[in-house]
UniProtKB/Swiss-Prot annotation:
The modification Phosphotyrosine is found at Y6, Y86. The modification Phosphoserine is found at S83, S322. InterPro entries: Dynamitin. The gene is DCTN2. The keyword Iron-sulfur does not apply. The modification N-acetylalanine is found at A2. It comes from the Eukaryota. It is found in: Cytoplasm, Cytoskeleton, Microtubule organizing center, Centrosome; Membrane; Cytoplasm, Cytoskeleton. It is a peripheral membrane protein. It comes from Bos taurus (Bovine). This is Dynactin subunit 2.
Length: 403
């Protein structure tokens, strides 16, 4: 109970809950504070987009199969991450590529594009009527690009004044090497004819060559030549081949045939147009025409007989249908009446079924009630016998108490 000295003080709210006010913020808002922004120029601010970073590295894994980063005590070298022949710069680094890195990147991309084109050529059937960039045209352009890259590489090896034939860079390189070897042999022969001292320095005009084999270039050139040959054969077949026309007997059998089959068919048809053969063909055609006329006459007579038989059958059917058509309205009326009778019979059958079901339910209920009544009677008899025994005991006790 509160102290009575505070009962009559002014400003006290009576019959209301106690409220304790404070100037502090709620607990949920106390943790909120503004982070101090770093304005120093020594701190690099990097804006990271988590969604873009996740999409970039999604489904990417570092292959650790066969790698060993443990410390080594023996002389055997552990296998770590191996790098390729060169390293391509990443995107957005702001570092300018050197000519060597740019050449290596272009060569790598051309090789990847060549592999993809080879896969496309095996799966996609080229069309002679398409005007878009087909795999064959793309292979030609790739061959030209690869030859340009090879040419630039050879110029770097042999010097800026090297005259390289872009159509055959490998042959031009071989010829130039042979010329240089011949010049070296000649200079060597002239030097050995005179007397040389032991202090004479070696000839500085000698050239050291490094031979680089490029089997992928030969394979690519061969594939490009085969693709060009296939394209020319396809264009030639499309030019010689004609469309299938049912009305033109000369074009029969030419659709879908290759160039050799088409030429053989055309030679056979041209041979059939010889004068000696035409007389025989005309005689055969006359005999065939006579047989065709006989067949047409016989067919007309057969068709007339067939038509007459069908007309007779139709007339007999109409004769049989006439008496049935007269009695048809009465039959329809009778069917309508029988339909109503069938509907009433169906309703009556449903009522009988419902009545039978209700009767069975009542019989079951009566049977259950009879069973319950028997149980009640048995229970009442037992209770009456028990009550009579209790009253007898009470009478005996009363008599004993009265004595």
């Amino acid at each position: 109970m509160a102290d009575p000295k505070y009962a009559d003080l002014p400003g006290i709210a009576r019959n209301e809950p106690d409220v304790y006010e404070t100037s502090d913020l709620p607990e949920d808002d106390q943790a909120e504070f503004d982070a101090e922004e770093l304005t120093s120029t020594s701190v690099e601010h990097i804006i990271v987009n988590p969604n873009a970073a996740y999409d970039k590295f999604k489904d990417k894994r570092v292959g650790t199969k066969g790698l060993d980063f443990s410390d080594r005590i023996g002389k055997t070298k552990r296998t770590g991450y191996e790098s390729g022949e060169y390293e391509m710069l990443g995107e957005g680094l702001g570092v300018k590529e050197t000519p060597q890195q740019k050449y290596q990147r272009l060569l790598h991309e051309v090789q990847e594009l060549t592999t993809e084109v080879e896969k496309i050529k095996t799966t996609v059937k080229e069309s002679a009527t398409e005007e878009k960039l087909t795999p064959v045209v793309l292979a030609k352009q790739l061959a030209a690009l690869k030859q340009q890259l090879v040419a630039s590489h050879l110029e770097k090896l042999l010097g800026p004044d090297a005259a390289i034939n872009l159509t055959d860079p490998d042959g031009a390189l071989a010829k130039r090497l042979l010329l240089q070897l011949e010049a070296t042999k000649n200079s060597k022969g002239t030097g050995s004819g005179g007397k040389t001292t032991s202090g004479t320095p070696p000839d500085s005009s000698l050239v050291t060559y490094e031979l680089h084999s490029r089997p992928e270039q030969d394979k690519f050139s061969q594939a490009a030549k085969v693709a060009e040959l296939e394209k020319r054969l396809t264009e030639l077949e499309a030019t010689v081949r004609c469309d299938q026309d049912a009305q033109n007997p000369l074009s029969a059998g030419l659709q879908g045939a290759c160039l050799m089959d088409t030429v053989e068919l055309l030679q056979a048809k041209v041979g059939a147009l010889d004068l000696a053969v035409l007389d025989q063909v005309e005689a055969r055609l006359q005999s065939v025409l006579g047989k065709v006329n006989e067949i047409a006459k016989h067919k007309a007579s057969v068709e007339d007989a067939d038509t007459q038989s069908k007309v007779h059958q139709l007339y007999e059917t109409i004769q049989r249908w006439s008496p049935i058509a007269a009695s048809l309205p009465e039959l329809v009326q009778r069917l309508v009446t029988i339909k109503q009778l069938h509907e009433q019979a169906m309703q009556f059958g449903q009522l009988l079924t419902h009545l039978d079901t209700t009767q069975q339910m009542i019989a079951c209920s009566l049977k259950d009630n009879a069973t319950l009544l028997t149980q009640v009677q048995t229970t009442m008899c037992e209770n009456l016998s028990t009550i009579e025994g209790n009253f007898a005991n009470i009478d005996e006790r009363m008599k004993k108490l009265g004595k």
